[in-house]
């Protein structure tokens, strides 16, 4: 009898234990870790704890939560990656978990052009992306092309005078108004862009006859040609190997992106010409936008404002921090004392690309 009673008690305990395990599992969301820690990203320890979304602050996803997939070509420890994380954090907190941002970084969803093609093709596989402002030029964002003109911004303050203006809002909405299927949420910047090479350089004359990587962008093509070099289109994801094998001799990127993508390993020379301030914007497809309620749309807009301000607060400090790390690691950094020859070399590019947009160009120039 005692043995039978003991057997019953043990069976009951086992059943209760299995039941307890069954109800506890769903409390841990499965999607969040994959979205926040792409396989190719840099170790989480590289991003200061105060600058990354804290896990304990994340909103618990609602049962009927809308998940928006967000693409980022760079790692999360870059200026743009950190800005993306801030946007994700703000959206999820402000929506109480009714909107989840599935952030996929380090180019796992493709290059900027790949991502844009996917977004414009519909289907909802990618809903949001952080892109270079000029990337929309071929997709109904002609005004945004002005933001990548060489030396249009004389300082960061000049850029932010534009980015916080009514004119910026007009630029953000242009693609949607032209029927391209995407709209801008907010602007930011990733620092001034500089050329870097696999060979030793001294000044502007060091580029003559060299192959310099460009994206499929007419302004960058013109800029490189103005330096006497040969523009060579290479996908961003293939740039490291292209530099390593000599397919190209150099390229250009903001300082933080140059380091995070390990380009110093194959191109350890950088000249600080600052030809363009890397204006960025975060865009969303009209398809994704239209499935949100007006309240949820407002949440994205307000979260974008916070992320934009955050971007402004970290950009210069992060850039200087990385620049010092590059110098300490042995990268050859060449200062440019006189920018005049560079400005003269790119005048034809500016004159050609402001045709029909002269008034907008002048408005931006006057904001400095």
Model segments located where?
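Short, low-complexity disordered leader/linker segments with a strong preference
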Residues: 1-67
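N-terminal secretory/targeting leader peptides
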Residues: 22-29, 58-157, 167, 177-368
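N-terminal glycine-rich phosphate/adenylate-binding segment common to multiple enzyme folds
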Residues: 160
């Amino acid at each position: 009898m005692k043995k039978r009673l003991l057997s019953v008690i043990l069976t009951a305990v086992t059943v209760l234990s299995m039941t307890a395990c069954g109800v506890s599992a769903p409390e841990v969301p499965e999607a969040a870790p994959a979205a926040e820690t792409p396989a190719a990203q840099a170790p989480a320890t590289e991003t200061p704890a105060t600058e990354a979304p804290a896990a304990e602050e994340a909103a618990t996803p609602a049962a009927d939560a809308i998940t928006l997939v967000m693409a980022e070509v760079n790692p999360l420890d870059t200026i743009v990656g950190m800005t993306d994380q801030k946007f994700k954090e703000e959206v999820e907190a402000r929506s109480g978990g009714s909107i989840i941002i599935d952030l996929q970084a380090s180019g796992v969803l493709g290059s900027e052009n790949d991502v844009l093609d996917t977004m414009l093709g519909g289907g909802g596989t990618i809903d949001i992306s952080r892109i270079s402002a000029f990337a929309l030029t071929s997709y109904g964002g002609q005004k945004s092309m002005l933001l990548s003109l060489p030396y249009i911004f004389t300082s960061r303050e000049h850029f932010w005078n534009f980015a916080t203006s009514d004119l910026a809002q007009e630029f953000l909405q242009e693609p949607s108004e032209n029927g391209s299927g995407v709209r801008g949420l907010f602007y930011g910047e990733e620092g001034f862009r500089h050329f870097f090479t696999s060979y030793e350089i001294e000044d502007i004359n060091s580029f003559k006859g060299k192959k310099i990587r460009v994206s499929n962008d007419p302004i960058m093509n013109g800029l490189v040609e103005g330096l006497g070099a040969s523009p060579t289109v290479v996908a961003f994801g293939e740039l490291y190997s292209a530099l390593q094998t000599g397919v190209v001799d150099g390229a250009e990127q903001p300082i933080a992106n140059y380091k995070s993508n390990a380009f110093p390993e194959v191109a350890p020379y950088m000249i600080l010409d600052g030809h363009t301030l890397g204006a960025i914007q975060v865009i969303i497809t009209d398809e994704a936008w239209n499935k949100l309620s007006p309240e949820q749309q407002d949440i994205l807009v307000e979260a974008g404002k916070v992320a934009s301000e955050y971007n402004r607060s970290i950009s210069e400090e992060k850039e200087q921090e990385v620049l010092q790390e590059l110098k300490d690691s042995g990268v050859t950094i060449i200062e440019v004392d006189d920018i005049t020859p560079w400005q003269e070399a790119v005048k034809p590019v500016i004159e050609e690309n402001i045709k029909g947009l002269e008034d907008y160009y002048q408005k931006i120039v006057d904001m400095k």
